[in-house]
């Protein structure tokens, strides 16, 4: 698979076909797009495969950069498949329903590899072979938020259109990414609203979470989960998440993700420091790795839940504290001297304060799990030097058929 730097940049002028722009994308790029060029413009295309010739409807412009959707395929790639969703590519939720899932994984691996090489090659950091964890690409989400609105008297319920706040109604059969229980719950809610047995919701969103096979309100109820994971023996762990609290959204990959983290974290640590600890799920799975565990999280509700979760699993010597890692420093030298760090930040990546602390403290090693590979690699490029090696990179496809994916990296000091 060619990178965009290797592909030939067309110097041809823009061609118009049936009132649409005729383009030939040359490579895959981040965020689910392929890229095409004219003499002066660059185009990012949804629903287009490199090598195809496509009629394009432009949706967004910023200077010489354009974003659009391939509406008709004039020259079809052998890699193209028929979409299994009637609202793709109009719906902004999915990016890869025009290729097989195996091809999607290849594309995501290629994009991660290219980003790593772009940021780290100048520092002569050796990049290990990328591993992939994946599961069933259908019905995987345990949380969902549907956009609500009206077009005249017609009720709209679905996801936003690409580059728009126009709502695309869900297909009658529901969203392929959602469990059938959740699709049924959304449909039933709207049916009852039409009948008048439910008051018309004034909110602009409708959010649910899946607890086993039961669908509950995302913002109004806490939820309980359990998983059997090998750490290394098979063990059942249980945890709760407060109403509105964060959880990993892929119900099929929580156990494999935790097992991979367990595999990568070294044994017999004197203390593990976890930043952005959420409700304590990683601590529950990995407490046997260390005599002491300390986690920091901005949400006081999540911190209190993390303390309850370790007790639910009969675990001691774990503590969790509320701290805004964007604005506040960790002021304990003892804590900063923890032998291993684990970080699972939001999409924006590590805060400047955390990154500065990491560089100053230079721990023996750390694990970084992120749903934004661009900010992860950016942070790595600022930290990695001749004293450290990148010993593992694992792509965890938490978000099949979409432009997103999770990445776990392990960094450790050289011998």
Swiss-Prot record:
UniProt keyword annotations, A-Z: 4Fe-4S, Iron, Iron-sulfur, Metal-binding, Methyltransferase, S-adenosyl-L-methionine, Transferase
Record: residues binding [4Fe-4S] cluster: 85, 91, 94, 175
Keyword Glycoprotein included in the entry's annotation: no
Gene3D superfamilies: 2.40.50.1070, Nucleic acid-binding proteins (2.40.50.140), Vaccinia Virus protein VP39 (3.40.50.150)
GO biological process: rRNA base methylation
Sequence similarity: Belongs to the class I-like SAM-binding methyltransferase superfamily. RNA M5U methyltransferase family.
Pfam families: tRNA_U5-meth_tr (PF05958)
GO MF annotation list: 4 iron, 4 sulfur cluster binding; metal ion binding; rRNA (uridine-C5-)-methyltransferase activity
Protein name: Uncharacterized RNA methyltransferase LIC_10086
Translocase is among the record's keywords: no
Active site, per annotation: 371 (nucleophile)
The EC number(s) this enzyme carries: 2.1.1.-
UniProt organism field: Leptospira interrogans serogroup Icterohaemorrhagiae serovar copenhageni (strain Fiocruz L1-130)
InterPro entries in alphabetical order: MeTrfase_TrmA_AS, NA-bd_OB-fold, SAM-dependent_MTases_sf, U5_MeTrfase_fam
Annotated S-adenosyl-L-methionine binding sites: 248, 276, 297, 344
């Amino acid at each position: 698979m060619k990178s965009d730097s290797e592909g030939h940049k067309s110097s041809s002028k823009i061609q118009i076909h049936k009132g649409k722009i005729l383009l030939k994308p040359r490579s895959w790029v981040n965020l689910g797009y392929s890229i095409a060029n004219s003499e002066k413009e660059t185009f990012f295309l949804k629903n287009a495969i490199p090598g195809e010739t496509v009629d394009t409807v432009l949706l967004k412009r910023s200077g010489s950069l354009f974003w659009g959707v391939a509406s008709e395929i004039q020259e079809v790639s052998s890699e193209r498949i028929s979409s299994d969703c009637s609202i793709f590519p109009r719906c902004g939720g999915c990016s890869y329903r025009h290729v097989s899932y195996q091809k999607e994984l290849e594309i995501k691996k290629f994009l991660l590899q290219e980003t790593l090489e772009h940021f780290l090659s100048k520092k002569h950091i050796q990049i290990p072979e990328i591993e992939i964890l994946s599961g069933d690409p259908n019905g995987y989400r345990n949380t969902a938020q549907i956009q609500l609105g009206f077009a005249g008297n017609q009720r709209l319920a679905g996801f936003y259109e690409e580059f728009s706040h126009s709502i695309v109604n869900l297909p009658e059969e529901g969203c392929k990414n959602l469990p059938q229980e959740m699709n049924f719950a959304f449909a039933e809610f709207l049916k009852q609203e039409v009948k008048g047995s439910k008051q018309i919701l004034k909110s602009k969103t409708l959010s649910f979470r899946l607890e086993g096979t039961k669908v509950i309100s995302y913002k109004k109820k806490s939820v309980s989960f359990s998983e059997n994971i090998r750490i290394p023996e098979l063990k059942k762990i249980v945890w709760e998440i407060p109403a509105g609290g964060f959880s990993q959204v892929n119900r099929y990959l929580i156990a494999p993700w935790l097992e991979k983290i367990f595999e990568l974290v070294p044994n017999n640590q004197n203390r593990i420091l976890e930043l952005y600890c959420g409700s304590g799920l990683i601590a529950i799975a990995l407490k046997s790795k260390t005599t002491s565990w300390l986690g920091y999280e901005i949400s006081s509700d999540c911190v209190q839940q993390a303390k309850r979760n370790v007790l639910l699993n009969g675990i001691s010597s774990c503590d969790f504290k509320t701290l805004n890692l964007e604005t506040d420093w960790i002021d304990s030298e003892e804590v900063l001297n923890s032998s291993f760090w684990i970080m699972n930040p939001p999409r924006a990546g590590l805060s400047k304060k955390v990154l500065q602390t990491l560089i100053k403290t230079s721990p023996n090693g750390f694990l970084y799990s992120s749903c934004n590979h661009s900010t992860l690699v950016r942070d790595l490029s600022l930290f990695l030097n001749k004293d450290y090696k990148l010993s593992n990179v694992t792509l965890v496809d938490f978000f099949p058929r979409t432009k997103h994916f999770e990445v776990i990296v392990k960094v450790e000091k050289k011998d």
